Amino acid sequence: MDLSLIQGMSLPLYFLLTLFFFFFATAKTRRSSSTGTLPPGPPILPLVGNIFQLGFNPHRSLAAFSKTYGPIMSLKLGRLTAVVISSPEAAKEALRTHDHVMSARTFNDALRAFDHHKHSIVWIPPSARWRFLKKTITKYLLSPQNLDAIQSLRMRKVEELVSLVNEFRERGEAIDLARASFVTSFNIISNALFSVDLATYDSNSSSYEFHNTVVHLTDIAGIPNVGDYFQYMRFLDLQGTRKKAVLCIEKLFRVFQEFIDARLAKRFSRTEKEPKEASSIDMLDSLLDLTQQNEAELTMNDLKHLLLDVFVAGTDTNSSTMEWAMTELFRSTEKMVKAQSEIRQVIGQNGFVQESDIPSLPYLQAIVKETLRLHPAAPLIPRKSESDVQIMGFLVPKNTQVVVNVWAIGRDASVWENPMKFEPERFLLRETDVKGRDFELIPFGSGRRMCPGISMALKTMHMVLASLLYSFDWKLQNGVVPGNIDMSETFGLTLHKAKSLCAVPVKKPTISSSY
């Protein structure tokens, strides 16, 4: 997400002076056009525009600006024009009414590593190629039929998470909840793709490097790079993000190639009398079938980029959301007790949470929605206008970076009562979902570029949170009190807690007859 590159932007004075003299002759203002007027916005500094006004948490800075300049405003980010949307009405107009011209995306320089921006389903513009990739990932991983087929896999990985947490309970130790949840989500993906675990909570394990590389790549994609705002400087890679991304992707592609080679060797050694068992076919098998068709639309290179997309996009959202949910519940212990009571009453004393139980847990569902309202994993939704368009009466020129501030919409007092308070009860009284139809709550986006993995993400979020609340009581470590929990954020591709939530699991009480 391009705006994530703003965080930490701090350039030496000599470099600013060099840029100033290099671009001064071509610097432009933004306020008017022969075909319309841009939205209002904060004053622009020479050359750099509004970059330094956004700070380390641009979602917060943009939300503050919107209180002065309105629900649609414009900024100058170096050489780029950006339009920021901060209301459900403007978001609906951009993502639904004008979806046909707002479905492209800007991307940062790190994503140019290995030409990922030319192969990624996340970043390539809408086209026949993009539709083919979306159809492929839906058909072989994210369709309702496939999600049902790997239900037992999800259950098994959640049970392994509960077993891991129980080991910490027996030792009386605190567990890093985000990391534990990340491992669960990661291994659901790796088993659906390769039929193996590729993540572990143990940092000494050989598989730790792979999942740590994915995490590192996600972080790199949120590091600022001057080349995104001054394209003439792109080749310098001043922050070194492209070089670091190349190293990460190279490692991941090497692992992917090992799996591909091993699978192909197994296929070649199989005789005609030894057909593939249906139960042993994973997504890699299905994708390899596509690469071996006559006039195949999917090459081996495409396959590796698609696998990269699935790992990067399919794991971080769940762990971040789960960590924020548990954090908010620790800060409102009566709500944690209420959720545990609901879950334990439905499941009973010695059962296991099943996916089929989730519809019977409305308060749990409300907690997930409220967490996504206050702490959307992706606080800013990026788009790019492919032609001139009018939104809320203002001009959005062709090739403008359009950003929907989901974080600001979720905390808008004109939309939500007591918007800064964690109140899951609000969703027991209103019919609002997170699937892109209700624009006051769009953590997964909306329109044709909405996250295709939303169903899988929601299934995993609910199962992980329900299982942790059902199986254990919880306390904070080292005498930390709820009111002193660090709520600071780290802005990037996803919105993480700056300080991980570590908590001590406690044996749950025996359910009384009053349940």
From Swiss-Prot:
Record InterPro entries: Cyt_P450, Cyt_P450_CS, Cyt_P450_E_grp-I, Cyt_P450_sf
Pfam family, one: p450
Membrane topology: Single-pass membrane protein
TM segment ranges: 5-25
Main location: membrane
Domain of life: Eukaryota
Protein name, UniProt field: Cytochrome P450 76C3
Zinc recorded as keyword: no
Gene from which this protein is expressed: CYP76C3
Organism: Arabidopsis thaliana (Mouse-ear cress)
